[in-house]
Amino acid sequence: MAAAALVNTPQIPMVTEEFVKPSQGHVTFEDIAVYFSQEEWGLLDEAQRCLYHDVMLENFLLMASVGCLHGIEAEEAPSEQTISAQGVSQARTPKLGPSIPNAHSCEMCILVMKDILYLTEHQGTLPWQKPYTSVASGKWFSFGSNLQQHQNQDSGEKHIRKEESSALLLNSCKIPLSDNLFPCKDVEKDFPTILGLLQHQTTHSREEYAHRSRETFQQRRYKCEQVFNEKVHVTEHQRVHTGEKAYKRREYGKSLNSKYSFVEHQRTHNTEKPYVCNVCGKSFLHKQTLVGHQQRIHTRERSYVCIECGKSLSSKYSLVEHQRTHNGEKPYVCNVCGKSFRHKQTFVGHQQRIHTGERPYVCIECGKSFIHSYDRIRHQRVHTGERAYQCSECGKSFIYKQSLLDHQRIHTGERPYECKECGKAFIHKKRLLEHQRIHTGEKPYACIICGKSFIRSSDYMRHQRIHTGERAYECGDCGKAFISKQTLIKHHKIHTRERPYECSECGKGFYLEVKLLQHQRIHTREKLCECNECGKVFSHQKRLLEHQKVHTGEKPCECSECGKCFRHRTSLVQHQKVHSGERPYNCTACEKAFIYKNKLVEHQRIHTGEKPYECGKCGKAFNKRYSLVRHQKVHITEEP
């Protein structure tokens, strides 16, 4: 099929001087031209016809550039008027150009090219026209070469002389002369005939031929025998050999050698992970990573077993890396800071980003930048509110998978991180590291304003709010603001009256678990702090220190407004509300407000009728403690 033949066009031999050696005979353009029948031409689409036109024109120009030598070596090249659709003129022109000496195109070659150009320019719109007529038989032909072949068969000759064939073809040529000019696409010049344009274009052929020769050299130089369906794929593939990187990332200038690699790389700067594993649902940035995951995780045999924990791995390299978690080996050491790593990938990432300060992954919501792309992806869940990891026990959801794993230890009771000094165990490794600083005395977080140091970074951040006055955590019920979130949570229980931690000995309830533990020491007499002055015991050292101020008379907390002094800071804070007029405790029954919480509790007993203070002598009950004390004085005066 002709159409298929043109799509898979074989390489047309390059015409060089080897074709025109006298010992091998003369080669003309007609010898290497390709022809189609009327039916075959009708099967070609516009793109295929254009390709045919370009190939034939290139071969013609190449033949003209090296010289056809078809019996006219000593003659000068014909001009525009020499050969045309109208006939032969006697006008002559000099050689085609100074850059191509002795370059000629014989009349036969020009006529063949005119046939091809006529057909391709009309694009088969007039397929019934057959401008070549045989004088002997009266038959019509689409191409002059077909007419010549027919006449050879009629005469029994295999070859005819050039003079006879040229005259015959010229006399039988019925190509209508177009009124339009033929422009050169290389320079702004028009020609009245196709032949004039062809002769002019041979002046460009030497430079074009040299350029194509360089391209051919590069193709041979980097030849790797890979085959591609489209030219664009060949161009991108050649960049592998040349090292060219045509696609550049705007964010930080990374260059890549193909558009596909560029698109794949861009996914590292966003959250797109289009390749999803159909077995486990895990998604990946690149198709190659997905294929590797499926081969390694789901299909590949896990024949390497860790003798420490029994975990199976798919490769010996993975087993060696895994065993470092047991033996503590960290072979990759940073020569800048001395930090060591178990995995080479982590080590390389540390060197590339930590010491250079590079943070290429920027959150478009808040502008925060990150060293790794996965850190940015996890951070963006803060803005989207996505909590993909849910606890199957209590339904609580988390942003990070590690947070879920840590939370689940609350249900299982697992505390894998144990202190070697005191044996105390922790759920989180971070808590163990913070605890170990108690034994070492290390306090790495120092306030630059007052110099106070802290074991935990959270304590340091909370302390800084004292200097800045920031109270970021506000109560939604009463509008009171607090420095820390933990203090706000404690405060909320005032409104809800929630006391979830109850003592099993006396039934007393507490807001916090730590308060319950401190209280239980009273019953167990464990680690009680006893006052040397009066023998009173306390469950916590802090309470003992506050109590001892009663004996010493120390009142270190002074009011800046009135100069009144107090033993405890909490008492000073409560007192300062007298000056500010703040009354944060409101009665829900009568909307009366109070400065102190205990005053609100006492007031509410008026509405409830509760009288918890009962006299042991007469059984009379009171709603306030001082009312009971005042009543008991009556019984004292009655005694003899």
Curated annotation (Swiss-Prot):
Gene3D superfamilies: 6.10.140.140, Classic Zinc Finger. It comes from the Eukaryota. Pfam families: KRAB, zf-C2H2. One of its GO terms (biological process) is regulation of transcription by RNA polymerase II. One of its GO terms (molecular function) is zinc ion binding. The keyword Transcription applies. A zinc finger (C2H2-type) spans 217-241, 247-269, 275-298, 304-326, 332-355, 361-383, 389-411, 417-439, 445-467, 473-495, 501-523, 529-551, 557-579, 585-607, 613-635. Residues 27-140 form the KRAB domain. Its main location: nucleus. Keywords: DNA-binding, Isopeptide bond, Metal-binding, Nucleus, Repeat, Transcription, Transcription regulation, Ubl conjugation, Zinc, Zinc-finger. GO terms for cellular component: nucleus. It is found in: Nucleus. There is a cross-link at K223 (Glycyl lysine isopeptide (Lys-Gly) (interchain with G-Cter in SUMO2)). May be involved in transcriptional regulation. Belongs to the krueppel C2H2-type zinc-finger protein family. This is Zinc finger protein 549. It comes from Pongo abelii (Sumatran orangutan). The gene is ZNF549.
